[in-house]
Amino acid sequence: MINDLWYKNAVVYCLSVETFMDANGDGVGDFQGLQRRLDYLAGLGVNAIWLMPFQASPGVDDGYDVSDYYNIDPRYGTLGDFVEFTHSAKQRGIRVLIDLVVNHTSDQHPWFKQACADKNSRYRDWYVWSEKKPENADEGMVFPGVQKTTWTRDEKSGEYYFHRFFKFQPDLNTGNPHVQAEILKIMGFWIQLGVSGFRMDAVPFVIAEKGADVKESKPQFDLLRSFREFLQWRKGDSIILAEANVVPKENLQYFGDDGDRMQMMFNFHVNQALFYALASADTRPLAKAMNETRERPQTGQWGIFLRNHDELDLGRLTEKQRQAVFSAFGPDKDMQLYDRGIRRRLAPMLGGDTRRLKLAYSLMYSLPGTPVLRYGDEIGMGDDLALEERNCARTPMQWSTEPHGGFTKAEKPVLPVIEGGPYGFEHVNVAAQRRDAESMLNWTERMIRMRKEAPEIGWGSFSVLDCGDTGVLAMRYDWRNNAVVIIHNLHDKPVDISFDPGVGESGRVLIDIADGSDSSADEKGRHNMVIEPFGYRWYRAGGLDYLLKRSDI
């Protein structure tokens, strides 16, 4: 059972094959290059790798426009290379999750081409059509300001097809049983090749009712259960990590009341509140967001993240909160995207302040759920705002001071490596940070190890402690008769705090598992301490014999 729930206390590392490591020198990352860097990832301490899209694609939307679900982009290698990679990852105790993009295909997919060429094609009903342009065609765009409509006329058939995303990404008719069966077939194919699960893209759109006549789309939650049942049958410990940016009251519908749908979901609600907390030094909305997303099945888990490959979506904050985050982290219009988010990486958003960067990641590792780290974040990589839209934060990994950061020997990489300035590969790279005991990379390795040694965070229940300052977040996790207490000061000044851990006699001594600064309670059982600007503490309640006190249930 514990093995089936491996994701509860894991650390996930997200990367793009295209920009991670180029082995054959053509300027594009590939699976052979990724395989050669597995020892690096194993040393970092991650349990799972989440791969962004790598299947065959015209590449108009960074692989999210798939043209063949059963093959990989030839630039990245062959299916044989992929199998060798998954096998090598397994040997190092690393699982592989892959993006599953089944809300839509590329308009170059053979299914869509046949659907356009012949109205009687078996693939016609695999997509969503309308004889005339629906009245609401200018509503519901995913990319406002860039996207003009969700319905586009197909010149061959004269009818309009639906696309929630760009016009070159026609939506699959996921209400069609034949499409549903094909999705299961796709999942089964990649499970057979060694993957341990999927990060399912755009889940609310996948399960939505689609069609010109649909006025109020009702989610088809039974689809999620069928996906889960299929995976349980094929490989019991495989999972789906759902991208579902929904309001908290809908979360249980995605997890399933009995935990029979999605095993994991990204916690967008907490993510947005976390950035507001970092911008304002007010932790109350963050504590509120954690409480609002507290309820989940015992087998369910949140994916906790800071930045991902998309823009930082602030759409669920209030207007005042959103403007505060924009002002702090993305004041220029060039830093913003789609009227709702920021397209920067975290390090430049925080002004390169290592104290704030470590504070932010310490928060990520300590929030309820499983941390998801993005490639390059472990060394504090920057962004290139000269690149279009989201590409500014998708630049190649910076390995060394060699040309193009050691990513490729080609004259021209697939995307330019950041060069010059404080975030250039000359200054920010893996090789240099390996030699520096106080580097971001070595700190991240220590933090991942510490997080994995605190299963209370992944498995236990949490309480927010009153420490007398709204700019300080103090939390306690309880699991199997063990407790950890974690404190973060979001102020840019030192703060005096006082708190009761709330665990009785075992809370009189707090052992610092981060730097050894233990704390003893006063005669009233309260701990009094000064937390430095942007400081944090990780404590374990009781003595270091906690493992002997841990109960079996």
Task: Label the model's feature ranges.
Residues 1-553:
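Active-site and adjacent substrate-binding regions of carbohydrate-active enzymes
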